[in-house]
Regions:
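Short, small-residue-biased leader/transition segments that mark boundaries at the very start
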Residues: 1-6
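Switch II (G3) loop of P-loop NTPases
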Residues: 82-103
């Protein structure tokens, strides 16, 4: 999810946490694909080369690892990388369907599950079905590590949530699901990646978002809310 990309970016490069990502979303592997695009530009473009050098020398911060994986291998891959280095947080990108036993198995090994939702009825219904299955099949059997499941509003039109969202949130509450207080607004800036034109970037696996674009994005507030839920103290 886009909001996850920004959370990792902010946690690792701004807040000072050590983050790792296991991309199990086969066959898209969108995070692994973004890392490959980022690396290609960073290696070929002098502007990004200098940016990477400055970041490493100033922060002493390498890029967070992105492991291309699958739902079958997800937990083994996570165990392998956490044996090699100490990470504060390991994020998993999982497919948006639970019709596979390996997805259920991987999910049951998560500590927390945070799923993005939008006011698009089809997307919302699909996500709610997903999370209901997670709650019913995994948590109620008692065979899981899950400490909490949460939803986060993504692509919210306008600065304020409308009455429509309140109606949706009533339905969500009736299903026994929790929604985070912070929402992510809909904005074209979120699509800004590394480019040959060196425009201020927002979405990257190698660099933090440009401060001018971060304002009003709610990424900082969302990250702080998640850190509170996870009982992690601020490293920043």
């Amino acid at each position: 999810a886009a909001s996850d990309v920004y959370k990792r970016q902010y946690l690792h490069y701004v807040k000072g946490y050590d983050v790792a990502v296991v991309d199990c979303d086969y066959p898209q592997h969108s995070i692994a694909g973004m890392r490959q695009r980022d690396l290609k530009l960073a290696l070929e473009d002098n502007h990004y080369k200098a940016l990477a050098y400055e970041q490493f020398t100033r922060l002493g911060k390498k890029a967070y690892p992105v492991v291309e994986s699958s739902t079958e291998r997800a937990i083994d891959d996570a165990d392998r990388i956490t044996e090699q280095a100490a990470f504060d947080l390991v994020f998993f990108d999982l497919p948006g369907t639970v019709n596979n036993p390996s997805v259920i198995r991987a999910l049951s090994n998560m500590d927390y599950i945070i799923a993005p939702i939008s006011a698009d009825r089809v997307v919302l219904e699909s996500t709610l079905r997903y999370m209901t299955v997670v709650n019913d099949v995994i948590r109620k059997t008692g065979v899981s590590n899950i400490k909490g499941t949460y939803l986060v509003w993504n692509m919210v039109d306008g600065r304020e949530k409308s009455e429509l969202y309140e109606v949706y949130e009533q339905v969500i509450a009736e299903l026994g699901l929790q929604v985070l207080k912070t929402f992510i607004p809909d904005s074209k800036r979120f699509r800004r990646e590394l480019s040959a034109g060196h425009r201020p970037l927002f979405r990257s696996t190698l660099f933090p978002a440009d401060r001018s674009l971060l304002r009003g994005s709610n990424i900082d507030a969302l990250t702080d809310e998640v850190l509170t839920l996870l009982n992690l103290r601020d490293n920043g």
